[in-house]
Amino acid sequence: MNQENNKAAFNNEHICSKMTNASIKNIKTPCHKNLVYTSAGDNANLIKWITGNRNFDLWITHYGNYQGRYRELADYYNIRKDGKFPNLYHAYHVWPYIFKQYEAILVMDDDILISPAKINRLFKIRKKYDLWILQPAFDPKGKISHRITRVKPYTMLRYTNFVEVTCPLFRQDKLERFMRIYNPVLVGWGVDWWFLDVLRNDMKDKIAIIDWVTCINPLDSTKDGKREIDRLQTPNQRLETWKKIKRMHCIQNEEKGQMEYAFVPKPLPLIFVSKILNLGQSLKRIILKLFESIRFYLNS
């Protein structure tokens, strides 16, 4: 009952915020068919996402202390202090007509290290394979919370039953379906299992981890000693909230564990090039010169 009251209070807040949205910045019409959404503090890595050509618009919900920070980077901008998915829930219910104009939406932590070229490729892969939810694989230079999300060198993508909450990319209608059910009292722990449970029917070949696109999730040791999410709720609070949500919605997929069903192999030339890039500099130069000689011979 308390959770239902919390959700009702949350919805009332939406109505108020819709009437007083002076902090909003938005473009009149989308420039692209894809959207990246993030809830950003004052130490985000957002500039790295947009330095270069891109096939996506950017929505920033700022929860930091420096008023107007990142506003010039955003296509859509609002101010609200909460977690990533509660802030997304708020935005989705206040401005649903904006989200519905997009084909796909990447919901990303603000500290993820990734280039616009890689984000572009994620959206292209989603469309090519008609995926419902996907994520970039995690580079081992950063934090890896689930072994299944660690990049594998010889596959382009792996069909799985799991995508982590850190940076999931949704087909728009699938995100909308989850937003109808989601309760913003759940800040972090278990959100991924919940949105996967919503899509549990016929989701084979629709959920994937993309090894061809990697990102770095910075280690906690590189931050100021405390995770932003811990400022909202302690780990114990998040775990207890997740247990209550699981019971209320009969969510059982977490107990079944994470699985890979199938994979798409990386093309052989890409595998070979990646191997070359890991060789010593002198041997690399020899092989590249050999390639140039072969190409010159074939073109002559």
Regions found by a protein language model. Name each.
Residues 1-72:
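N-proximal low-complexity "stem/linker" segments adjacent to membrane-targeting elements
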Residues 2-23, 34-35, 185-300:
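C-terminal catalytic/acceptor-binding lobe
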Residues 64-66, 137-142, 213-214:
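Short beta-alpha junction loops
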Residues 77, 150-154, 226-228:
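Short, hinge-like loop/turn segments at secondary-structure boundaries
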Residues 115-201:
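Conserved catalytic core of nucleotide-sugar-dependent glycosyltransferases
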